[in-house]
Amino acid sequence: VGVILAFIYAMHKCKQFGLIPDHVFDVAFVAIIFGFIGARAYYCIFIDTDINFFDLRHGGLAIYGGIIAAAIAAAITCVIHKVNLPAMFDVGGLGLLIGQCIGRWGNFVNQEAYGAPTAGSLPWGMTGTTIINDPMVIAKQAELDAAGNGLFALVHPCFLYESLWCLIGFIALHFYSKKLKTFDGEIFLLYITWYGLGRFWIEALRTDSLFIGPFKVSQIVAGGCVIVGLALFILGKIFKTKKRGYVMYKDSEACKEKNEAYYARQKMLEEKAKAKKAMKQAGEEAPSIIVNDEASDNEETSADTEKKEEKTEKSESNEENTPDKTEEE
């Protein structure tokens, strides 16, 4: 559902960034496929147990692997189709926030990607049939039972934190892109910075993280995204917006020419389709017209025949009533 809604949004939003819908479709299609492959590969690489890449029964996807693979695939596709890469990444960043916001609720259904046990009094803490069997939750519950306060061991709903974080980011960047965007690629840089900040904090609460030595992989990647994204954003604001004659892609002549050619071609194809449909309808109506013409011809023929017969009868009757001149003489 998240992928579908993200795709619909990107197709609707692409005109604002000067992108052609067909190009967005091609890039999104490739990015989605490689995104799933990358998410699985990332998980299999960093998981501390042996796992079969193709054994999906036990799940195992990592969002950062999906983002990295999707970004690489999208970049290659943009180069092949000669599409403006920064503008495409801006649309992609907004779409990713939608997909992540909704997709995280799959963790709730599967009772996974949750955080450490709380003190038991957290109003939005969660539990479940899978969660209560977690060794850390069992230990926390024993501690609470020993205290005799009647509380249950609840865990941090990390999926909810990330879903809300992505929702807030999407709303903010959606409106930011309309009025405040000043250079191509800016929205994507803000996306990786915003998501990196939230993920770094949320990952500290999770108990199922992937590790490199003593460090959580997602925290390393998130921290790197924040540093790189923020640095490039500041540099873009300093150099691109102050650069004399800088024009965003959507306002460039190249963009206008591409869009004019594309929509002119679309209009021509629509007119051809309408003409073809009209010809088809005319072809379906033609047999009925022919049948009606034949019926009218048959009616006219029968009427003429009746008139001829009447004339013949009259002429015969006149001959019988006329006296023979030879007899009179």
Task: Say what each PLM segment does.
Residues V1-T301, P323-E329:
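A feature for loop-to-transmembrane-helix boundaries and adjacent hydrophobic helices
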